[in-house]
């Protein structure tokens, strides 16, 4: 029965998206340990705790931090995770891995939630604190890699300032099609379906000195971004990926600041030059995309499920 259900699900995905899930049967053997010194290929340390306090990890001992930070006010994570938290709390190893309370902690959660008195400044301060702690733990020239997307340029500037303030530099971005095309809150909308993996490298105070921004530097970054966009669109449309205008703008923002490095923070005059040029580029992003097909509203299983309820026409 399990196999037949799995095959049926795979066929549904194949019919709708012309793709199929592949299961290789590999298993993961892992026995959690409590002491960081005992970590090896089969013995991880599992913790459920505040990422601003990683005292159990020795400084400059980690090659790379891979994470997925909360997206501002997009999702109330702690409230949603309680469904799973209560089961983890009942686990035989609950106390060992940090599930010491029956529901998830919410007081210190890094999120934008006006009801809880948490504004955007609180969110940015929290993200910066986490990135700063990561900077302490990664080795010299180590990496911080995380996924991010946001329609707001202000949100991008906030996350970039957190990156730089913590002692990292954005080196590269990798667009990745999201696991699901849409959710209940983004169906039938001009939403973002492309995640961006931002690769940031640890820098020292003496390395990578800031350069005075000139119009030529900004134009070169724009040109690099344009070439990257065209190349990315070509790759994604070969597999029939959907692109909305916000998708393309997000890729452009990430690649632009990757090309620019830390320079845009050098002074307010330079910052104004950078942002004004970037905004013009973003406003004309459909012209940059040219003949590539741009999706006006996201399709997906939620859209199909609620099509009749919402009286959505094809």
What are these regions (language model features)?
Residues 41-66, 71, 287-314:
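Segments forming glycine/polar-rich beta-alpha architectures that bind adenosine-containing cofactors
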Residues 183-184, 188-236:
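Flexible, glycine-/basic-rich loop-and-beta segments that form/coincide
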Residues 70-71, 85-92, 132-139, 143, ...:
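Hydrophobic alpha-helix feature that most strongly marks membrane-spanning transmembrane helices
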Residues 46, 51-55, 60-140:
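SAM-dependent methyltransferase catalytic-core segment centered on the flexible catalytic loop
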Residues 14-66, 123-125, 129-130, 143-149, ...:
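Flexible, glycine/threonine-enriched loop-and-boundary segments that flank and lead into catalytic domains
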Residues 38-41, 137-140, 188-193:
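A structural signal for short secondary-structure junctions
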Residues 223-314:
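Long, compositionally biased intrinsically disordered regions
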Residues 1-15:
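Single conserved hydrophobic/aromatic residue that forms the stacking wall/gate
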């Amino acid at each position: 029965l399990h196999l037949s259900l799995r095959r049926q699900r795979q066929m549904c995905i194949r019919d709708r998206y012309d793709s199929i899930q592949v299961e290789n049967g590999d298993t993961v053997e892992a026995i959690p340990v409590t002491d960081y010194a005992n970590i090896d290929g089969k013995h991880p340390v599992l913790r459920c705790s505040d990422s601003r306090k990683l005292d159990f990890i020795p400084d400059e001992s980690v090659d790379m931090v891979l994470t997925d930070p909360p997206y501002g006010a997009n999702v109330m994570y702690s409230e949603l995770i309680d469904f799973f938290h209560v089961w983890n709390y009942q686990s035989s190893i609950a106390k060992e891995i940090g599930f010491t309370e029956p529901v998830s902690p919410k007081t210190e959660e890094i999120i934008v939630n006006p009801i809880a008195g948490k504004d955007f400044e609180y969110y940015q301060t929290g993200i910066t604190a986490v990135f700063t702690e990561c900077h302490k733990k990664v080795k010299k020239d180590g990496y911080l890699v995380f996924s991010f997307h946001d329609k707001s340029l202000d949100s991008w500037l906030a996350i970039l300032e957190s990156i730089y303030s913590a002692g990292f530099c954005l080196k590269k971005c990798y667009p990745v099609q999201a696991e699901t095309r849409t959710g209940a809150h983004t169906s039938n909308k001009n939403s973002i379906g492309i995640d961006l993996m931002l690769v940031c490298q640890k820098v020292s105070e003496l390395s990578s000195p800031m350069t005075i921004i000139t119009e030529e530097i900004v134009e070169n970054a724009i040109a690099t971004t344009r070439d990257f966009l065209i190349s990315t669109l070509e790759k994604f449309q070969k597999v029939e990926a959907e692109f909305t205008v916000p998708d393309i703008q997000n890729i452009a923002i990430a690649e632009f600041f990757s090309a620019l490095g830390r320079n845009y923070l050098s002074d307010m005059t330079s910052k104004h030059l950078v942002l004004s040029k970037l905004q013009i580029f973003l406003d004309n992003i459909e012209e940059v995309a040219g003949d590539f097909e741009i999706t006006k509203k996201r399709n997906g299983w939620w859209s199909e499920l609620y099509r009749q309820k919402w009286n959505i026409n094809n």
